[in-house]
């Protein structure tokens, strides 16, 4: 999520810059960050590197509202890392302070905003204070997720896509076999995962932001159909593989990537980002059924989802989109129940708008 009260277009550019890989200058730290720049940190926990796997050494800073931080937290749970990597949760709103400093805030107590926590390491009031402790001249965004090394008091990594992958393997040497053997990127599915994740990230995970932060009718009209083309494609993939997961019987990082966006879709993206050509529960029965299974039957997904944080972040921190900061009550229920194990009984849906179908064919 974005930290600066910029225009919608600048915010969208910042999101894309955070997510997409680009050429970087030579690093000046062991975490691959160029001091004094806007570059991200790219450190990795490995047994033979400067960031070794140790219980309690690292802390993960997240926002329960942010889909990209959500992905890292889901992996943390799936790998049984809750006791190994504690988390600190920032408040979903407001952003910045009265002096103009941007970034997310920590509550002063656990009761100030349920689910958010005071910073236990430095008593910081704002997330940007941690970034400046590592690099006082840092010029980038103060984003979550952020993996912090308490031993060296430095940032390890703040790239969500890298943490999604690295948390799967970095602590295997100190985990019991029950969790060390868990992989979301199995060898026999890597090609398919890489292919799908490319368009899923571009058209769905970040596609909703391109639509929601559009500043012209032309941009909005261009980006919304792209989102639904990706949903149409995902609907068919789930049906073709027979469930219960995106690629069939194997739970993979595609499920994590898709869940973090889909769980927010009917709740936020339909109304707040005007992605309203359809809804998950009414137009995508395969995705909706898949969502029910993950949410109700795989604890790592439900346990990391907080709809109050999600809804209030979007509706109360995007003043240009929702100036009165009113948070809608619905939809209800947030996630429907009654998962159907036999996918042959679940119809395959999708949005039939001609432009959406044309874009889907190109994926």
Model-derived segments and spans:
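C-terminal alpha-helical interaction module
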Residues: 1-363
């Amino acid at each position: 999520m974005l930290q600066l009260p910029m225009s919608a277009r600048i915010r969208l550019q910042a999101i894309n810059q955070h997510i997409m890989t680009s050429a970087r200058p030579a690093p000046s730290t062991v975490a691959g960050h160029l001091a004094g720049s806007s570059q991200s940190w790219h450190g990795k926990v490995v047994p033979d590197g400067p960031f070794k796997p140790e219980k309690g050494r690292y802390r993960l800073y997240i926002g329960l509202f942010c889909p990209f931080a959500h992905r890292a937290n889901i992996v943390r749970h799936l790998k049984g890392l809750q006791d190994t990597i504690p988390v600190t949760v920032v408040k979903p709103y407001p952003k910045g302070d009265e002096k103009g400093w941007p970034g997310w805030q920590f509550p002063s107590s656990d009761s100030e905003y349920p689910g958010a926590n005071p910073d236990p390491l430095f008593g910081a009031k704002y997330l940007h204070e941690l970034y400046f402790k590592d690099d006082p001249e840092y010029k980038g965004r103060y984003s979550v997720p952020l993996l912090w090394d308490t031993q060296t008091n430095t940032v390890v990594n703040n790239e969500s896509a890298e943490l999604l992958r690295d948390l799967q393997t970095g602590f295997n040497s100190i985990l019991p076999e029950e969790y060390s053997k868990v992989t979301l990127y199995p060898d026999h599915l890597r090609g398919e995962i890489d292919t799908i994740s490319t368009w899923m990230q571009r058209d769905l995970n970040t596609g909703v932001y391109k639509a929601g932060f559009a500043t012209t009718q032309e941009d909005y009209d261009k980006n919304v159909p792209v989102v639904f083309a990706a949903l149409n494609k995902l609907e068919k993939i789930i049906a073709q593989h027979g469930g219960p997961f995106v690629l069939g019987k194997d739970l993979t990082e595609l499920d994590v990537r898709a869940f973090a966006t889909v769980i927010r879709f009917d709740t936020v993206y339909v109304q707040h980002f005007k992605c309203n050509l359809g809804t998950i529960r009414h137009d995508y029965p395969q995705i909706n059924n898949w969502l029910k299974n993950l949410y109700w039957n795989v604890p790592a997904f439900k346990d990391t989802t907080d709809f109050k944080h999600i809804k209030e972040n979007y509706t109360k921190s995007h003043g240009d989109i929702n100036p009165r900061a009113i948070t809608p009550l619905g939809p209800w229920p947030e996630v429907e129940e009654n998962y159907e194990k036999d996918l042959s009984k679940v119809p395959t849906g999708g949005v039939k708008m001609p432009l959406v179908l044309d874009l889907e064919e190109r994926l």
